[in-house]
Every structure is written in structure tokens, then in C-alpha cells.
């Protein structure tokens, strides 16, 4: 069953901008809360939308048709990608339809983009409140703070990083190998490890009531959220090896090519310069990447400005094209180290994954798909 709700574009964009400003100020103060991930919770009965990233939260009034049929639900989107989309759209009401992906309609056009956390509900592509896992907060934060202490004093890893929790279907296990069982029978559909910012451990532990230690943990995409009563806090994940939310909805052929990082980076940089002449800094900057035998064609054309780059790559598969936001592509390549990068494409209706040659670092870029 599809879930549909409507929100004003201007109100939503202003809320996103304010959250980004809060996160950027916090980051400037060393709190490391860049809004890479937005957690969106919709209360079906109260017709309210809660948008949060880091410690910043905004509530927005929305309209949900047939609200009696819907419980509260939540889903995730990438922050900068979602913000760029909103800025590119004109004023007016935006209607969101959630299936395996999200369709955003503004009357004249429909924008389709992938949402995070869809693996539990393949039919509708969302998570509900039933996917919060109940844990003992007193034990959780005691373990996490002990790990921070070990990192700071023993120099096990960079002090800004805490390899905090291993996740399995039955329990959480901190890296001191002491098991911490879940209180409820909530289902965790994967095994893996997540990586948290150290500063979040200390700040979050002081937010919650130690005399009432039971709380809930929610992990979705690039964020881990904590909830106890009326207190909620979220932190972005600095890294993880599971769950693989990027491949929740794989569609189209999956192909991999290898390319020289500097060659693609310079081509993307030249395209950024051209794009700013025609589109301006505040607009969505769509670019197409086409793979053919041992070639990648990067093409940008808008409002009379255009550029085409042909890059040598290692690729012998079928021709394939994806449409992306140029700035996000440039940032992703710039953040990858090494001489050689691997690019995984799943077609126009999915995403691309860019990794370094040995697979230690990964960036994921959602697609742009406009249907008029």
C-alpha cells in the first residue's frame, strides 16, 4: 500500500536549511554534526512531520489523506541531496508517495529518488516504530564510555572514532566482547559493525535518565538514533560494514569499472566550473555518466552551457547511463584516496557506489530521475 502525504515546499526547504545551519554551527564548534542524513518521521494521526539531523529538529504541519489508515512511520534521505532537490523546485505543495522509492510531485513534474531503510518493508519501502530496538541504556552508555576511555588513553585508534557496537539478530556486542542482550524481541535483520563519533557517546549519555535506563535504538542508513520518553538524539555513523542500505533496492544491471581517480576528478572539476556559469551555485546540477567499452562519457548541458569529457576506464560490459548531481559526484571522488577507484553502477533508476581500489572507503550517490 502506498503512503502519501503533502507538505509545502517553502516550509520544508526552510526547515531543512535551518537544520543544516544548526549542524554547520555545531561542526564549526568541533561537534562534528554535518547533516549527511535526514531522519523523517511522520505522525499519521497528528498530521505532523519531524525532520531531524544530528541534534537539530524541526516540526512541520502536513496533510495525510486517510490518516486513520496510517500509524507513525519514518524513513531516511541523504541530507545534501534532499536539500538540492528542494532548492531546485518551485514554490507550492509537494506530494510525497512512498513505495520502494519516494515520488515527489509538484504538479508539473515528478522527482523519483531512493530512500534509506527500505529493506524491512519491500512492499512500501519504509520503517515503522516497531523497528526501534529496546536496550538497557545504562549498560549501553557505560560500555561506550569505557571504549572512549580506552581510545583516549591507549591510542588504539583515532580518538574521534569509536568502533562501538557489533550487531547480530540476537544482541549488541561492544568491542570489549561483552554481550549486551536486547530486552525486547525486536528483529535485527543483519549482522555487522558500526562506527560512532566519540563525542556523541559522552554527550548522549548525559541526556537520558539513568534511573529509568530503558530506551530505544534505531539505526538507519548513516544515522543512529536514541529515544527515551520525550528525549531524542541522533548521530551520524562515521562508518559501518553492514547493513548495506545502499543496495536495498538494486535495479537494473550491476556493472563495475575501474578508473584513474585524478582523471575523473579533473573532468568533474572542469564540469563544475562550466555548470556554475549556466546554473548557478544554488541549483541542482545534473550530469550524465555513460559507460561503454573502456570509456566513460561525462556530459553536462543546460541553458546553453555544456561540456563533454571522455575518460579511459577498464570496462567491458554493456552500455549504461546514470544521471547524478555533479557536485555530489565531485565531492565523492575528492573524498576517495588512492590512484585507482572502482565505480559500481546499477542503472538510471538506482545509485552508484564509488570505492577506493581495495574497498576500504566508500561513497554512495543517489540518482536524479526527472519525469515530465
Model-derived segments and their meaning:
Residues 1-372:
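Structural preference for solvent-exposed beta-strand-turn elements
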